[in-house]
């Protein structure tokens, strides 16, 4: 047998070493991040990726070192005057109104379900009664037509020719 030819597609990029990037500027193992680098990738990609991590670490350091500029203003916004309601009371009232609305909605849903159940039970009874009436009507029609048809067929052999003609004319007269 002939050997099956194998095609191997070589990738242009080769996975190289892992590069360690310091995120927070500390020399700890926790702040170090390992990144897979491609050896054949463009130099600008590796420079831009490390540059963005360096920017991130610088921005993080700046944010951690920053302190609020106006401490007095922030403290004055927390403390409310005596005449106004506190934010805690406002939030409690808001939560209570939301809960009241939810319970009202639930009660309305329950009432609608009860009304629908009553309406459904009435409509169900009406549907059952109408089905009974239809069944009784169909049974009585079938009995009368079937019985008449069967008697005609069984006794048609015993009839004379003028009797058969008169039977046919009577049937045609009732069909009009």
Swiss-Prot record:
Record flagged with keyword Cell cycle: no
A biological process from GO: viral genome replication
Disulfide bonds: none
PTM: O-glycosylated.
Single annotated GO MF: ATP hydrolysis activity
Pfam short name (any one): GBR_NSP5
UniProt KW keywords: Glycoprotein, Host cytoplasm, Nucleotide-binding, RNA-binding
Intracellular or extracellular location(s): Host cytoplasm
Presence of the UniProt keyword Nucleotide-binding in the record: yes
Gene Ontology CC annotation, any one: host cell cytoplasm
Protein role: Plays an essential role in the viral genome replication. Participates, together with NSP2, in the formation of viral factories (viroplasms) which are large inclusions in the host cytoplasm where replication intermediates are assembled and viral RNA replication takes place. Orchestrates the recruitment of viroplasmic proteins such as capsid proteins to these factories.
Subunit relationships: Homodimer. Interacts with VP1. Interacts with VP2. Interacts with NSP2; this interaction leads to up-regulation of NSP5 hyperphosphorylation and formation of virus factories. Interacts with NSP6.
Family according to the record: Belongs to the rotavirus NSP5 family.
UniProt name for this protein: Non-structural protein 5
Organism: Rotavirus X (strain RVX/Human/China/NADRV-J19/1997/GXP[X]) (RV ADRV-N)
